Amino acid sequence: MTEVYDLEITTNATDFPMEKKYPAGMSLNDLKKKLELVVGTTVDSMRIQLFDGDDQLKGELTDGAKSLKDLGVRDGYRIHAVDVTGGNEDFKDESMVEKYEMSDDTYGKRTDSVRAWKKKMQEEQGSAAPMENESDKLNEEAAKNIMVGNRCEVTVGAQMARRGEVAYVGATKFKEGVWVGVKYDEPVGKNDGSVAGVRYFDCDPKYGGFVRPVDVKVGDFPELSIDEI
């Protein structure tokens, strides 16, 4: 039987950790490829740090050809992926005033920004996924094609695609607009179907999440096998 590790994945691209399963024999380079959409950068611009079960830094993983097991990764460890270009920090550090005051036209011309990376990925993949600043009208139109019980795949920004089942579609009390509640196949969500004391659907903790309709694709999206995760 293939040895599989349960790992916590964190990144400087998001404040929310994810729990993923990876084969012990997977190479570091293959892991980086899996994390490209999560970190928002390419394999060559990614650093990987390893933390043990007590969250103590073990070191940086650099040999891309070696397996996770050979590099000292073990079940329950944490993998922290870092974009060395610092591009995705534009969205996290509120003290970086220059980033927020930069004109949209100037930012759009940058080739090292997260926006440029996402545009490149969309062109390569032929994706029609809307960008982050789509109007409420687009969300309302997208919601018309989403029904409770649909299998779906969720892609928010540069994060890794997540699969699950649509559990709620409609307005919420926590924020205006149309939202889709998703019951994920894995514990990659933020809640149990409730937000601020209001329950919208039922699921286990960390298996639920709410996203905008434009970030949801419905269709034949079965649960991923270990090799596909």
Curated annotation (Swiss-Prot):
Keywords per UniProt: Chaperone, Cytoplasm, Cytoskeleton, Microtubule
Compartments where located: Cytoplasm; Cytoplasm, Cytoskeleton
Function: Binds to alpha-tubulin folding intermediates after their interaction with cytosolic chaperonin in the pathway leading from newly synthesized tubulin to properly folded heterodimer.
Protein's recorded name: Tubulin-specific chaperone B
Family stated for the protein in its record: Belongs to the TBCB family.
Gene giving rise to this polypeptide: tbcb-1
Subunit structure, as described in the record: Supercomplex made of cofactors A to E. Cofactors A and D function by capturing and stabilizing tubulin in a quasi-native conformation. Cofactor E binds to the cofactor D-tubulin complex; interaction with cofactor C then causes the release of tubulin polypeptides that are committed to the native state.
Source organism per UniProt: Caenorhabditis elegans
Gene Ontology cellular component annotations, sorted alphabetically: cytoplasm; microtubule
GO BP field: post-chaperonin tubulin folding pathway; tubulin complex assembly
Family annotation (SUPFAM superfamilies): Cap-Gly domain, Ubiquitin-like
CAP-Gly domain mapped to chain residues: 170-212
